[in-house]
Amino acid sequence: MILTDILSSERVRVAARGAHVQSKDDALRALAALLGNGATAPGEADFYRVLVEREALQSTGIGDGVAIPHGALENLPGQVAALLICPGGVPFDAIDGGPVYILFAVLTPKRATGEHLKTLARISRLLRDTSFRQKLLAAADGREAHGLIRLAEEGRAA
């Protein structure tokens, strides 16, 4: 499995500076909407609820401007991901206290715990690379950001 198998370009968004994403809740709502893009059931409201419940346990802001909101749903047919890039930054209660610029959300069926952990590890490895994060932040739109992820996963320089 590669990330672009569960992350379509329609689920990637680059938010304009000063756009509607100015808080953690705004970011979670935007991610839920992206995750719900094309979904019938479960939908956006379920996705938002799961992300908020997970954030209530502990922030998924892992530092270096990155957050990986995630969770599991009983009736989800397969893994789904969304990417939200906020060049202006979002306060997110990250572990390092800094704002978050890159939010990569993943939802998984409850029965797929192993798959979920592998996906989170894959995202973490990808976003550990400072130069890759800078390229994502410089992406003009979601399609370009999606292409950068695809290239990185194919082992080509992004």
Language-model regions, residue ranges each:
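Cytosolic covalent-transfer regions centered on His/Cys nucleophiles
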Residues: M1-A158
